[in-house]
UniProtKB/Swiss-Prot annotation:
Compartment(s): Cytoplasm
InterPro entries with a match to the protein in the record: Class_I_gatase-like, HST_MetA, MetA_family
A Pfam entry, by short name: HTS
Organism for this UniProt entry: Vibrio vulnificus (strain YJ016)
PANTHER family in alphabetical order: HOMOSERINE O-SUCCINYLTRANSFERASE
An example Gene Ontology CC term for this record: cytoplasm
Chemical reaction(s) catalysed: L-homoserine + succinyl-CoA = O-succinyl-L-homoserine + CoA
Name of the protein: Homoserine O-succinyltransferase
HAMAP family: MetA_acyltransf
Record carries keyword Amino-acid biosynthesis: yes
GO molecular function, one term: homoserine O-succinyltransferase activity
Lineage top rank: taxon: Bacteria
Gene designation: metAS
Function: Transfers a succinyl group from succinyl-CoA to L-homoserine, forming succinyl-L-homoserine.
Sites annotated Important for substrate specificity: S192
Length: 313
C-alpha cells in the first residue's frame, strides 16, 4: 500500500526516485477504493491444482481482489471435472464486454508444439488482443510468456535441446524497478520448460525492461515500459511437490528426465524437496498487484482507456 505524506515533504522526491509509491495528501483526499478485478486464463490441464496455486499468491495482499476464472474453449477436459468447469469458469463470450484490472495467463504443456499447431492459438490471440483495450496489466507465465512475446513482438519460438527443470539462482538488474521492490539481490525460482529466453536476444529484439536473469535459465522476469505486460518465464506459483510430480510422470511415460536441478536434498529423489522459492512468489505477485495493477488502473473500469491510468502527481 502507498504511504501518505504532506505534499511538500522533502523526503518525497527521494522516495520517488527509488520508485516508492508516495501518495500526496491532495491525491489521497480524492482517492476512492474498490476491489480489484483479476481474470485468470487457466491453460493448465489440472485446473483445480493450478487455480489454487495462483489464488494462494493473490491472497497475500492487503488489497481486495475479486477473481474470475476463464477457460480457453468448451472442449471436455481429461483432468478437471466438467461440473467444476461449468460452475466456476467463464467462457470468453461472457467477459469480452467487460474490463479488468489484471489478467493472468498461465503456462501450458505445449513446449514442443509449434504455435500454429496449438488447437486454440487463434482464440488465444483474440484474448491477448482484447486485453490491450480491456485490461490494465497482463501477467504471462511460462509458456504464456513465450506466446505473448510472439504476439506482441513477433519473436519466433526458440526451444532448448533438453528440458529445463529445477530451481535456479537469479540476479536482479534494476533494483529500483517497482516489480523488484523488496527482492533480494539473488533469489531462487523454479523452471519447467523447453522454451529458451536468451537475455541478449530479448535485449536486441524488444524494448522490454529485463529485470531478472539466470546464468542457466536465461531471462526470468521482464516487463514492458508501461508495466502493462509482465513476463515470468518460470513457475513461482508451483507447490513444493509440483516438479517432483512432473519428474515421476515423465519417468512413468518411459522418458529419461534429468533430476530437477537444486531441488532434492543431495539430488536424491527419495528425499522430500524443499520449497526455497515460496517467499519470492508471494512478493512477486504482491508487487504486480500493487505497482502494475492497483497504482495504474482507473477507478471506473467501465470507462477504461489508457488515458485513464493513474498518473503520479
Amino acid at each position: 500500500m502507498p504511504i501518505r505524506i504532506p505534499d511538500q515533504l522533502p523526503a518525497a522526491d527521494v522516495l520517488r526516485t527509488e520508485n516508492i509509491f508516495v501518495m500526496s495528501e491532495t491525491r489521497a483526499a480524492k482517492q476512492e477504493i474498490r476491489p480489484l478485478r483479476v481474470l485468470i486464463l487457466n491453460l493448465m490441464p489440472k485446473k483445480i491444482e493450478t487455480e489454487t496455486q495462483f489464488l494462494r499468491l493473490l491472497s497475500n495482499s492487503p488489497l481486495q481482489v475479486n477473481v474470475e476464472l476463464l477457460r480457453i474453449d468448451d472442449r471436455p477436459s481429461k483432468n478437471t471435472p466438467t461440473e467444476h468447469l461449468d460452475n466456476f469458469y467463464r467462457q470468453f463470450e461472457m467477459v469480452k464486454n467487460r474490463n479488468f484490472d489484471g489478467l493472468i495467463i498461465t503456462g501450458a504443456p505445449l513446449g514442443l508444439v509449434q504455435f500454429e499447431d496449438v488447437i486454440y492459438w487463434d482464440h488465444l490471440k483474440t484474448i491477448m488482443e482484447w486485453a490491450k483495450s480491456h485490461v490494465t496489466s497482463t501477467l504471462y507465465v511460462c509458456w504464456a510468456a513465450q506466446a505473448g512475446l510472439k504476439l506482441l513482438y513477433d519473436l519466433p519460438k526458440k526451444t532448448r535441446k533438453e528440458k529445463l527443470s529445477g530451481v535456479y539462482h537469479h540476479r536482479i538488474h534494476k533494483p529500483y524497478h517497482p516489480v523488484l521492490r523488496g527482492f533480494d539481490d539473488s533469489f531462487l525460482a523454479p523452471h519447467s520448460r523447453y522454451a529458451d529466453f536468451s537475455p541478449e536476444y530479448l535485449a536486441e529484439h524488444t524494448d522490454l525492461d529485463i529485470l531478472a536473469t539466470s546464468d542457466d535459465a536465461g531471462v526470468y522476469l521482464a516487463t514492458t515500459k508501461d508495466k502493462r505486460n509482465v513476463f515470468v518465464t518460470g513457475h513461482p506459483e508451483y507447490d513444493p511437490h509440483t516438479l517432483h510430480n512432473e519428474y515421476i510422470r515423465d519417468l512413468g511415460e518411459g522418458m529419461e528426465p534429468a533430476i530437477p536441478v537444486n531441488y532434492y536434498p543431495n539430488d536424491n529423489p527419495d528425499n522430500p524437496p524443499i520449497a526455497s522459492w515460496r517467499s519470492h512468489g508471494h512478493l512477486l505477485f504482491s508487487n504486480w498487484l500493487n505497482y502494475c495493477v492497483y497504482q495504474q488502473t482507473p477507478y471506473d473500469l467501465d470507462h477504461f482507456s489508457e488515458e485513464a491510468f493513474t498518473k503520479d502527481e
